[in-house]
């Protein structure tokens, strides 16, 4: 099962899923990331 949560350490407006995904994978060491309503959300196992 996976859960999504707001990436508090992501800076700025989330325009592209690629930048959010990169942040979640490389900075937060989570599965992936996507933009929702201009915010970056990371996906993790829960």
Curated annotation (Swiss-Prot):
Keywords: Antimicrobial, Disulfide bond, Fungicide, Plant defense. Epidermis and vascular bundles of pods, stems, roots, leaves and wet or dry seeds. GO terms for biological process: defense response to fungus; killing of cells of another organism. Gene3D superfamilies: Knottin, scorpion toxin-like. SMART domains: Knot1. Disulfide bonds join 3-46, 14-35, 20-40, 24-42. Possesses antifungal activity sensitive to inorganic cations. Belongs to the DEFL family. This is Defensin-1. It comes from Pisum sativum.
